[in-house]
Amino acid sequence: MTQKAKNTIYLLILIILSMLCLVYASVPLYSIFCKVTGYGGTVRTATATQSKLGKTTIKIRFNADINKELPWKFYPEIPYTTVKPGEQKLIFYRAENLTNEYVSGMAVYNVTPYKVGKYFNKVACFCFTKQTLSPYQKTIMPVSFFIDPNIETDPETSDVKLITLSYTFFKYKENTK
C-alpha cells in the first residue's frame, strides 16, 4: 500500500472519530447553549428578582402534560395569572400518584412564544430535581418566577401579552449503566 493511500485511510478514520465525538457531545452542548441563550423557549434560572418593575402586564398561562408511562395526575392550581415584568410570582401545581407503588418523575419545561425564553426566569421550581411520590400521595409543587423587565425594550418581545409556561412529566428511569 502506498503512503498516499495510508494517509487517506488515516484521514478518513480521523474524520469518523471526530464526527462520533461531535455526535456524543452535541446533546449536552445544545442543552447548555439553550440554557444560556433562552433559545427554543428554554427558561433561565435565577437566584433573585429584578429591582425595577416593568410598566406592562403580561398574562401567564400554565400548562401541564404527563407522559403515558407515568401514572400520575398533574395540573396547575390556577390556569393563568398576570404579572408585571420584574415582579416575582409564586404559583403551584398539584400532582397525585395513582398507584400503590413509589413512582418517580422528572419534569421538562419550556415557554412559548420561544422568543421570550431568555426573559423568563425561575427562582425555584419542582422541575429542577426528580420528584418521588409514595403510593397514592398527593402533593403541591411550587414554582417561583419573574420576567426580566428588559422584555419591554426588546423589539422582538415588546408586543408579547401572553406567555405559556408548559411542563411535561416523564417517568424517571434510573440509569442502569
Curated annotation (Swiss-Prot):
| Aminoacyl-tRNA synthetase in keyword set | no
- Which is an annotated GO molecular function term of this record? copper ion binding
SUPFAM superfamilies cross-referenced by the UniProt entry: Ctag/Cox11
* UniProt superkingdom: Bacteria
Principal location class: membrane
One Gene Ontology term from the biological process aspect of the record: respiratory chain complex IV assembly
Q: Where in the cell is it found?
A: Cell inner membrane
Q: Which residues lie on this side of the membrane: Cytoplasmic?
A: 1-8
Q: How does it sit in the membrane?
A: Single-pass type II membrane protein
A cellular-component GO term for this protein: plasma membrane
* Record keywords: Cell inner membrane, Cell membrane, Copper, Membrane, Signal-anchor, Transmembrane, Transmembrane helix
Q: Which residues cross the membrane?
A: 9-29
**Disulfide bond keyword on record:** no
List residues in topological domain: Periplasmic: 30-177
Give the UniProt family note.
Belongs to the COX11/CtaG family.
Q: What does this protein do?
A: Exerts its effect at some terminal stage of cytochrome c oxidase synthesis, probably by being involved in the insertion of the copper B into subunit I.
PANTHER family in the record: CYTOCHROME C OXIDASE ASSEMBLY PROTEIN COX11, MITOCHONDRIAL-RELATED, CYTOCHROME C OXIDASE ASSEMBLY PROTEIN COX11-RELATED
Q: What is this protein called?
A: Cytochrome c oxidase assembly protein CtaG
| Organism of provenance | Ehrlichia ruminantium (strain Welgevonden)
